[in-house]
């Protein structure tokens, strides 16, 4: 029994060792292609067993992914290692697979105005040393910046030019000139950035920050500003001659849900009566005025024809003559008729009337 137990233990140990080797060792018909720089493993073996896997397809995919990952890890253990802060790190080689970009390749930055001018004139940049010899201090100093050589800001005496005002402060003038140069350089930098991004720059002439606003727009803006307070403009003071805003918001008043049922019934019945009435509603006043206008126009046309016939027979009358024995409708005042004083030419369609169309009056010579 003891011999069998020892044999069983040895057999079990061999099986465990074989299982460990089986987990680490993976056999493939075609070797995988590795790109250790990108931690990439490409399997060129056709997945023949996945076509007829059926319900075990998910398990087959997991087993295949596990085997390929094991092969990739086996390759990583063969790389040279180094210890960094008590940790063992493998040094990856350069990647060999070119991965696609998420965004397009950036375009070359356009040249600035100075670069364009330098290329046109053939000016090439010359490298200058950062240190130069300062004759005043007798030591090497920086060419630019803090503690530079020939620093004019440290001078205690400035010579006044011959064409300058002797009472002008040359120190303040130099500081102002430097501020202007800095502002000009900043403006040129912003212009170069705008040209690089193809932005439309506003013209210097006719540039308005807020644009031209009409009277209505200004009034609307003022009204909105007044009601933008915590009290919604209720305690906002007004100017002495300020007019009340027109078209201000008003609360909608709805009819109560429970209240005067008689008024609600009356309004509903009136609406049904209007909808069910077959005869259209006629405006009597408008129809009467229209009929009177048509009659006046017909009568005026007849009188115009009669006046033209009288001109051919009797000649033209003087400007101050008045007709006698005319029809009663040609003189005086009447309601809704034609009348009034008449001058030379065709009879005037004038006079005072109610409900008619005012078509004339006294005519000039």
From Swiss-Prot:
GO molecular function: 5S rRNA binding
Cystines in this chain: none
PTM info: Citrullinated by PADI4.
Biased composition (Basic residues): 302-325, 351-365
Keyword entries, A-Z: Acetylation, Citrullination, Isopeptide bond, Nucleus, Phosphoprotein, Ribosome biogenesis, Ubl conjugation
CC per GO annotation: condensed nuclear chromosome; nucleolus; preribosome, large subunit precursor
Localization (cell): Nucleus, Nucleolus
Domain of life (superkingdom): Eukaryota
Alphabetical GO biological process terms: endonucleolytic cleavage in ITS1 to separate SSU-rRNA from 5.8S rRNA and LSU-rRNA from tricistronic rRNA transcript (SSU-rRNA, 5.8S rRNA, LSU-rRNA); mitotic metaphase chromosome alignment; protein localization to nucleolus; regulation of signal transduction by p53 class mediator; ribosomal large subunit assembly; ribosomal large subunit biogenesis
Chain positions found as N-acetylmethionine: 1
Chain positions of cross-link Glycyl lysine isopeptide (Lys-Gly) (interchain with G-Cter in SUMO2): 154, 226, 266
Statement: the UniProt record of this protein carries the keyword Nucleus: yes
Region (Disordered): 202-221, 229-254, 273-365
Segments of skewed composition (Basic and acidic residues): 235-245
Principal subcellular localisation of the protein: nucleus
Residues with Citrulline modification: 273
Coiled-coil region: none
Family designation: Belongs to the RRS1 family.
PANTHER family given in the database record: RIBOSOME BIOGENESIS REGULATORY PROTEIN, RIBOSOME BIOGENESIS REGULATORY PROTEIN HOMOLOG
Subunit structure: Component of a hexameric 5S RNP precursor complex, composed of 5S RNA, RRS1, RPF2/BXDC1, RPL5, RPL11 and HEATR3; this complex acts as a precursor for ribosome assembly.
Described function: Involved in ribosomal large subunit assembly. May regulate the localization of the 5S RNP/5S ribonucleoprotein particle to the nucleolus.
Protein name: Ribosome biogenesis regulatory protein homolog
Name of the gene this protein is made from: RRS1
